Amino acid sequence: MEAKDRLIVALDVDTRDEAISIVNAVGEHCGLFKVGMQLHNSAGFAVTEEILSMGFPVFLDLKFHDIPNTVGKAATVVSRRGVKMFTVHAAGGREMLRQAVKGAREGQGERRSGGPLVLAITVLTSVSQAVLHDEVGLPGSVEENVVRFARLAQAAGVQGVVASPQEIRPIRAACGDDFVIVTPGVRPLWAGTDDQARIMTPAKAMEAGATYLVVGRPITAAPSRAEAAKRIVEEMAEGLARR
């Protein structure tokens, strides 16, 4: 996979028109587009289907977290739609994760084509050590909890996780080279940190072993979105070369 194919551009906008404008601007410079709760709740599945119809893969980041049966049925629905990846919360437990994988396979079978990757959310990149302890109430370090969630997800048949750059190497050590790691919280040196607490540059994240990087505002808020995407891909390629 080339560096370009590993870049996921986050469509964290309110409207279909804004999203499609970004797709048109950077589609040739990235591998996938992420549709999250903000855009999905505004524009519905229609925008995902439109992006798919344009020939671009979609990472549907809705972070399912419910009882196992409900998550399994939701997984079947999104698998039928043809998305390449979707997310569930590892904190939902082993059975919920298993049902997500099962549901994705059932949806894949109905489509008779390659099904989506199921990705487990570990610890959100906005969560610091203090928040994890004092507000969420989990003992142990952020890294320990991320690795624990990653192992749980892998044992349940989930193909990968979403985790911050700082946890890439520990996850690789725990889960092996074939486990998919999708990494948000990536910021080039020329962009701000926004609301991410655990960040890293694109080059460093790829060097550490990330499979895909998710980048939003450094691209979507740039004066030239295409140029920003190209600069990030160049940095990613540098990191890949140093692995």
From Swiss-Prot:
Quaternary assembly: Homodimer.
Pathways per UniProt: Pyrimidine metabolism; UMP biosynthesis via de novo pathway; UMP from orotate: step 2/2
Organism in which the protein naturally occurs: Heliobacterium modesticaldum (strain ATCC 51547 / Ice1)
Cellular component terms (Gene Ontology): cytosol
EC number: 4.1.1.23
Identification of the protein by name: Orotidine 5'-phosphate decarboxylase
Pfam families from the UniProt entry: OMPdecase
Major enzyme class: lyase
Entry keyword Cell division: no
InterPro entries, A to Z: Aldolase_TIM, OMPdecase, OMPdecase_AS, OMPdecase_bac, OMPdeCOase_dom, RibuloseP-bd_barrel
Family: Belongs to the OMP decarboxylase family. Type 1 subfamily.
Gene Ontology molecular function: any one: orotidine-5'-phosphate decarboxylase activity
Gene (UniProt): pyrF
Record field: catalytic activity: orotidine 5'-phosphate + H(+) = UMP + CO2
